[in-house]
Each structure stands twice: as C-alpha cells, then as structure tokens.
C-alpha cells in the first residue's frame, strides 16, 4: 500500500515552513511571524478515514493505490459516471465490499489537503476542485451531486452503518469562500518554535483542479 504516516505529514509540513522561514530571514533579516493569507494543496483523491475521536482508522491510502477496481467498476455503472480507482468514494466502497471492520466507525473522510487544513484550522472543508476527486460534483450547485449521494446511500443501506455519505465528507467551498483561520494549535504545529502567530486566514484547500 502506498502510504504516508501522520508523522511524515507533520514533519513534511514543518520542514517546508522552516525552509520558507529561513529564506525570509536570509533575504530580509526578519523573523516570520505573520502572513496575509495562506493555503494548502496536496495529492488529490485517496482515503483518510477518522473516527469520532479524530483517530486515523487505517493508514492513509494515497491515490497511487490501484486496489479499488471492483468498487470503481460497480460505482461507475451504478452512477452512470466514471469513478476512477483513485477517487475517495472508490476507496470507501472497496473497504465496504471487503467488509473492513473500520468502516462502521467512520466519522470523517478527507484527502491529504483536507487533513492538513483541518489540523491547522479545525475546519472540515475542501475546495470544489479537490472535492471533485472525492465524489462527483453538481456543476450547478457547486456541491456534491445529491442524486448520486442518495444512490450511494441506498446501495449500502443494508449495512446499517451509523453514517450517511454526505455527513462524513468535507463541506465544499469555492474560491473566495472563508475557509477558516490558523488556530493556536495549528500555528504551533506548523512552526514549533512559536514565532508564527495564529489568526491568518486560509483559502479552501485545493488539488489539481483548484
């Protein structure tokens, strides 16, 4: 399985920010403490499933995992819409087909960019481009396709999970929407030195299409 640990993600973020901070110090002689705005992008698709205690249920399954062929084929036929293997809903349905124990405990399902944004702001949101790699988007409403959401929920209703699909997916935002601000915890996560101040506005987390 292609994966990255939460430790890898955290340390990668910190290394990236430390590089930016050092660059500012070298060029301008100033310690970076504030930014006008910020945003995050990451590899689209994949599968990061969390329980109600915000614990990761299974290792992060990245878009590179081609292990969802059965789910992708069935969903593509059911929804009359091409669902590639890398899409989050394909990973979710494959886990259901395999009767993976963790599925019943899912409280939140997101992507890498969505996870980073959530940890830094507390907001469970995605930009519409990134969200389109989780589940089909209705171009009129700029939100998840409600007809397809219902079709999926009907497909799995006999499983009697304690969740509905839309309730575990991130809220969809478009460019310019308020997506939260950097929290105190997020600032410390990004810059363990404590120099970075909270309160910086963030744009919706996006992917290839954002």
Question: Locations of the language-model features?
Answer:
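Glycine-rich phosphate-binding loop plus the immediately following alpha-helix
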Residues: 64-100, 115, 135-151, 157
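Short secondary-structure capping/junction motifs at helix and strand boundaries
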Residues: 26-35, 80-84, 100-109, 157-161
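Short beta-strand-loop/turn "lid" adjacent to the catalytic site in phosphate-handling enzymes
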Residues: 24-62, 82-84, 117-138, 169-182
């Amino acid at each position: 399985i292609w994966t990255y640990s939460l430790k890898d993600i955290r340390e990668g973020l910190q290394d990236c920010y430390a590089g930016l901070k050092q660059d500012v110090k070298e060029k301008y002689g100033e310690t970076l403490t504030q930014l006008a705005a910020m945003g995050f992008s990451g590899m689209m698709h994949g599968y990061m499933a969390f329980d109600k205690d915000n614990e990761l249920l299974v290792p992060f399954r990245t878009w590179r995992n081609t292990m969802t062929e059965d789910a992708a084929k069935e969903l593509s036929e059911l929804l009359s819409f091409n669902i590639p293997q890398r899409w989050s809903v394909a990973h979710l349905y494959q886990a259901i087909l395999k009767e993976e124990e963790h599925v019943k405990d899912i409280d939140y399902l997101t992507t890498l960019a969505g996870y980073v944004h959530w940890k830094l702001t507390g907001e469970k949101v995605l930009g519409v481009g990134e969200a389109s790699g989780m589940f089909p988007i209705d171009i009129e409403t700029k939100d998840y396709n409600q007809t397809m959401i219902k079709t999926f929920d009907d497909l799995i209703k006999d499983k009697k999970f304690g969740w509905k699909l839309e309730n575990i997916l991130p809220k969809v935002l478009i460019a310019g929407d308020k997506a939260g601000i950097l929290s105190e915890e997020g600032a410390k996560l990004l810059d363990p030195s404590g120099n970075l101040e909270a309160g910086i506005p963030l744009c919706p987390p996006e992917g290839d299409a954002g």
